[in-house]
Amino acid sequence: MINKKLFALAGVTLSLSLSAISAQVEPLRVAADPVPHAEILNDIKKIDPKLDLKVIELTSGVNANELLAHGDVDANYFQHLPYLKDQEKALGKTFVVAAEVHIEPLGIYSRKIKALPDLPENASVAVPNNSSNLSRALFLLQKQGLITLNAHFTDPSTTLATPKDIVANPKHLKILEIEAAQLPRSLDDADLVVINGNYALEAGLVPSKDALGLESADHNPYANLLVTTPELAHDPRIVALAKDLTSPQVRDFIQKTYHGSVIPVQAGHD
C-alpha cells in the first residue's frame, strides 16, 4: 500500500515537473506591426537563437493590447506610452513596459506641394484619429508653424490636444481625422498627410527623406515599447527579449536598415 502511494506521489511530482519544463520552453509570443517591429524581432532570432520567439504580425483592425489582456500573446511591440495609457483606460487593464526600444518620428507628407510654405489656404490635412496620435499630429503642425494650440498644451506626453484646442489657424486648414493605418492612402486626396513612421515605411516612404516636416528625436516621448502583463514582467523570456531589443547589435541593425527613419532610443537620447 505504501509503495502504491509512493508511486502515485512520484507520478504527480513527475507530471508537475514535466509541466514546468514544458512551460519554460514554450515560445514567447509577441504581437508586432510588420514594419519595423516584426523586422527587428526577426533579426533578434538571428542574434539570439536560444530565445524561442514567435512573432505574430498585426493586421489592420487587430488590437494587440486586447490580445495581451486575453492571454493570446505574451507581449506586444508596436506602441508608445501615451497610446498605452489611453488603452489601459479604455480596456480597464494595467500593463508593464519591459523596454523602450526605438522612435519612429511622425512625419508630414504631400504629393501636392514640395515644401510647407507652399501650402495653400483652406488646405486639407489628414491626421490620425486615435486620441494620442491625433494630439501628437497637432503638436507637430504647431511646431511647423501651421497652427497654434491653446497655451496650456505644452507637453505632448501629458496633455492630449484636439482640433477644438486650435486657437490660431492662419491658413484655415481643414483637419481630417482618419484611421492611422489608412493615412498613406490619403496622399492622393489630402494636401498634407501626417503619418506614423511605421505606416510610412510600409507605404514605401522614407521619412528621413520624404517628410516635409519630421518630429525631432531629442526628448521625444513617443518611444516604441515592449509591453507585457504584470504576471509576465519577470519572466526570463521577457527579460531576455528586453535585453536583446536594447542591445548594441539591435541598435546597429536599426541604424543600418532604416537610415534615420527609425531611431534607437539610445541614439535619440545621446
Locate the predicted segments by residue:
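Ligand-binding "clamshell"
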Residues: 86-98, 111-113, 187-189, 194, ...
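Beta->alpha turn/N-cap motifs
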Residues: 35, 59-61, 76-85, 102, ...
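A conserved helix-loop-strand patch within extracytoplasmic ligand-binding domains
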Residues: 98-148, 251
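Short, polar/charged alpha-helical segment
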Residues: 27-54, 63, 67-69
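Periplasmic-binding protein-like
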Residues: 99-110, 135-142, 201-243, 245-270
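Alpha-to-beta junction loops
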Residues: 69-79, 123, 146, 171-173, ...
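Short helix-initiation/N-cap motifs at beta->coil->alpha
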Residues: 56-66, 153-185
